[in-house]
A protein has these predicted regions:
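N-terminal Rossmann NAD(P)H-binding glycine-rich loop of SDR-like oxidoreductase domains
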Residues: 2-19
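Active-site segment of SDR-like NAD(P)-dependent oxidoreductases
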Residues: 8, 54-55, 92-100, 136-139
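Adenosine-cofactor binding site in Rossmann-like domains, unifying the SAM/SAH pocket
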Residues: 23-41
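NAD(P)H-binding glycine-rich loop region in Rossmannoid oxidoreductase-like domains
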Residues: 38-68, 97-98
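Glycine-rich NAD(P)-binding loop of the Rossmann-fold in SDR/ketoreductase-type enzymes
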Residues: 64-75, 107, 111-112
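Conserved Rossmann-fold NAD(P)-dependent oxidoreductase catalytic core, especially the SDR/UDP-sugar
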Residues: 74-108, 131
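NAD(P)-dependent short-chain dehydrogenase/reductase
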Residues: 108, 118-177, 182-186, 190
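Mid/C-terminal beta-alpha module of Rossmann-like enzyme folds, strongest
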Residues: 188, 192-209
Length: 209
């Protein structure tokens, strides 16, 4: 059995497609409390894909961010340690802020992700196997429900289909993002053979808007 948290989200749905032949236990954000109270089949779990979180970078709901992004993440990481289950966790490149030289989270979402990254670093030797991936700007199929949080690529594609043109803003050529296709993210997370650690997951090729 593979546990997939955030199974109804953009990236979670793409993991489900890739794992369609596997036995999956889906855990969505609203089910997290019930899952914590009732799930007892840890001995059947071969892998945890912890993709669930409040992902809105503009969220100011500190209570919800603390509960879902920090406390639930720490709890499921603790279960991975307790039962020695391999786990792969979705962090975020937002922990860096404007540069990659230091940690400088610019919003509460990024702070919540960095908090868990630090927790992982402190406990990394207790896991049987853990990989945390700092996703850069992921785009691809399934972004329809993300609204204003969708990638520029998704927004531009929708604009072309609806209006036949793309709306840019002044200075958009100076805004660079590392766009990475969701299928590549899924493939790398599921199939890479790197040791336990925290990794950046992007292309290393920033592109302007």
């Amino acid at each position: 059995m593979i546990i997939v948290t955030g199974s109804k989200g953009f990236i979670g749905q793409n993991f489900l497609k890739a794992l369609k032949d596997k036995e999956i236990k889906e855990v969505e954000k609203n089910d997290s409390w019930h899952f914590r109270q009732t799930f007892n089949d840890w001995n059947k779990v071969e892998l945890i894909l912890h993709q669930g979180a409040i992902s809105h970078t503009t969220s100011t709901n500190l209570k919800a961010l603390q509960h879902f992004n920090v406390e639930f993440s720490q709890w499921i990481l603790q279960q991975a340690i307790k039962y020695q289950i391999p786990i792969k966790y979705a962090s975020s490149a937002s922990v860096y802020g404007h540069t990659l030289t230091d940690m400088n989270p610019l919003n509460y979402y990024a702070i919540s992700k960095l908090t868990v990254d630090y927790w992982i670093q402190d406990h990394i030797n207790e896991f049987s196997f853990i990989q945390a991936f700092r996703y850069f700007n992921v785009y691809g199929e399934g972004e329809d429900n993300k609204g204003d949080q969708a990638s520029p690529i998704s927004k531009f594609t929708k604009q072309v289909k609806e209006d036949g043109k793309i709306k840019l803003f002044e200075g958009s050529d100076k805004f660079l993002r590392d766009f990475v296709f969701v299928d590549d993210v899924v493939d790398i997370v599921l199939n890479n053979d790197k040791p336990s650690g925290i990794y950046d997951l992007g292309t290393s090729n920033p592109t302007s808007f």
